[in-house]
A protein has these predicted regions:
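Cell-envelope/extracellular polymer assembly enzymes that use nucleotide-activated donors
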Residues: 20-23, 53
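Acidic helix N-cap motif at the loop->helix transition within catalytic regions
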Residues: 33-37, 62-71, 114
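Short, acidic, metal-binding catalytic loop of nucleotide-sugar glycosyltransferases
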Residues: 40-51
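A conserved acidic beta->alpha catalytic loop
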Residues: 41, 58-66, 82, 109
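Glycine-rich, basic loop-to-helix element that forms the pyrophosphate-binding segment
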Residues: 80-97, 117, 154, 171
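Short aromatic/hydrophobic "clamp" motif used to bind/position activated sugar donors
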Residues: 102
Length: 177
């Protein structure tokens, strides 16, 4: 990586002006308890609300997730009663995407305020085909197990930064890509 960087300057894409429309696909399974928090998080994103379409895909949820989502008229909800898994749910949602950018996230993943702009900014580079988010685990003092998970994701993030510097991506965490 260091040798490559001696000969090639790092990329620094700019955010397109005007900002393009984007769709945020939110995968959910029995997420009744998190709907309100996720919607607050979505409303706090630093991206124009009129340019960010929110689509929730609930796959086989048998709690009150869909009822909670009815409280948000700006949201499109795609529900399937039979659970087929996250990949099938996301694939089912793709035909509803009418924007040039689609961003996948999970209902229980809270996004950084600038996440959408940062993802869109990276796509200004025509060589970019996928952008992966960086997962940060909030460590709960009473839950020692999350400390190990936090260390793992720091390691994964370091590997992804190396991937980026080599103009490649081996994978993306399912929480944000």
């Amino acid at each position: 990586v260091k040798i490559k960087e001696l000969f090639v300057k790092p990329r620094s894409p700019r955010l397109p002006e005007p900002l393009p429309e984007a769709t945020l696909l939110i995968a959910a399974y029995n997420e009744e308890a998190i709907v309100a928090s996720k919607m607050v998080n979505c409303r706090q994103l630093d991206y124009p609300a009129d340019k960010l379409r929110l689509v929730w895909i609930t796959d086989g949820s048998n709690d009150n997730t869909n009822e909670r989502l009815k409280e948000y008229p700006e949201v499109t909800v795609l529900y399937q009663p039979r659970r087929q898994g996250k990949t099938a749910a996301l694939n089912r949602a793709i035909p509803y995407v009418k924007t040039p950018y689609v961003i996948f996230t999970d209902a229980n993943t809270m996004l950084n305020k600038g996440a959408i702009k940062e993802i869109i900014r990276q796509f200004s580079d025509p060589q970019v085909g996928c952008v992966a988010g960086e997962k940060r685990v909030e460590i709960q003092a009473e839950q020692g197990a999350t400390a190990g998970e936090g260390i793992y994701w720091k390691y994964e993030s370091a590997l992804k930064r190396l991937d980026y510097r080599l103009y490649s991506a081996v994978g993306a965490a399912g929480e944000l890509f």
